[in-house]
């Protein structure tokens, strides 16, 4: 018979294992995406097609019992994937896309770290019980700082004043990071609706492709509009 203390140890061990798996997955995926975005455009196309296919597959597995919800996925998933591929076709956008992914990765990572460190009030307990307001603030501000740090990399260049100015860059990055968290909650709504925790298990420590890339659902269109109108 496992005692309450024993159960707590098992939970902690599982959490540590997940963190290690997340780190290992990141060590593989992040460099792969950096290479694809900055130096190998065909690889980026392949990666995005694989991501889109994985997201659609997991969405189908989650929502096949509801035609209206299934159709929603056929709209909200192909659009951001297509926009990212479209933006990447122009060589001058490579640092914009690199910056975008750095923001998405940063807000997820630091929101998790901030939530575990500072704890506090839950952000949306019914949709995502682990998310906290402290995690949201930590993630958004950290993503803004990471974006500014990325802008100091040699050869970094975006042909847009607002993305080149450090103050505007910080503000824009925080806005994208905030929308990324809303995008996460948007997908969490459907996961709760269909009573699933993770959309899949293909990415160790992260769950499914949809779990890892849900932030692009709402943010890519905003990035595209910023690129056009700013």
Swiss-Prot record:
Establish whether keyword Cell membrane is in the entry: yes
Kindly state which keywords UniProt assigns to this record, in alphabetical order: Cell membrane, Lipid biosynthesis, Lipid metabolism, Membrane, Nucleotidyltransferase, Phospholipid biosynthesis, Phospholipid metabolism, Transferase, Transmembrane, Transmembrane helix
Q: Where are the transmembrane segments?
A: 33-53, 67-87, 95-115, 133-153, 167-187, 206-226
Disulfide bridge positions per record: none
Secretion signal span: none
The UniProt entry, under PROSITE patterns, shows: CDS
Catalytic function, reaction form: a 1,2-diacyl-sn-glycero-3-phosphate + CTP + H(+) = a CDP-1,2-diacyl-sn-glycerol + diphosphate
GO BP terms in the entry: CDP-diacylglycerol biosynthetic process
Q: What's its membrane topology? A: Multi-pass membrane protein
The reply on keyword Lipid metabolism is yes
Tell me the protein family, please: Belongs to the CDS family.
PANTHER family in the cross-refs: PHOSPHATIDATE CYTIDYLYLTRANSFERASE (PTHR46382:SF1)
Protein's recorded name = Phosphatidate cytidylyltransferase
Q: Which gene encodes it?
A: cdsA
């Amino acid at each position: 018979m496992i005692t309450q203390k024993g159960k707590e140890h098992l939970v902690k061990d599982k959490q540590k294992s997940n963190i290690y798996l997340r780190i290992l997955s990141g060590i593989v995926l992040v460099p792969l995406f950096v290479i694809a975005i900055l130096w190998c455009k065909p690889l980026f196309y392949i990666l995005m097609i694989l991501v889109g296919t994985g997201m659609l597959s997991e969405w189908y597995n989650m929502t096949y019992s509801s035609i209206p919800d299934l159709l929603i996925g056929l709209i909200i998933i192909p659009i951001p994937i297509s926009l990212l591929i479209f933006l990447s076709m122009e060589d001058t956008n490579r640092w914009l896309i690199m910056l975008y992914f750095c923001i998405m990765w940063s807000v997820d990572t630091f929101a998790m770290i901030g939530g575990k460190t500072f704890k506090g009030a839950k952000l949306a307990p019914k949709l995502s019980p682990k998310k906290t307001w402290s995690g949201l603030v930590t993630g958004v501000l950290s993503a803004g700082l990471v974006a500014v740090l990325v802008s100091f990399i040699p050869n970094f260049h975006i042909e847009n004043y607002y993305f080149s100015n450090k103050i505007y860059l910080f503000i824009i990055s925080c806005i994208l990071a905030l929308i990324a968290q809303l995008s996460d909650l948007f997908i969490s709504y459907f996961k709760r609706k269909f009573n699933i925790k993770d959309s899949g298990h293909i990415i160790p420590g992260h769950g499914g492709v949809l779990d890892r890339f849900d932030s692009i659902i709402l943010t890519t269109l905003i990035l595209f509009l910023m690129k056009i109108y700013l």
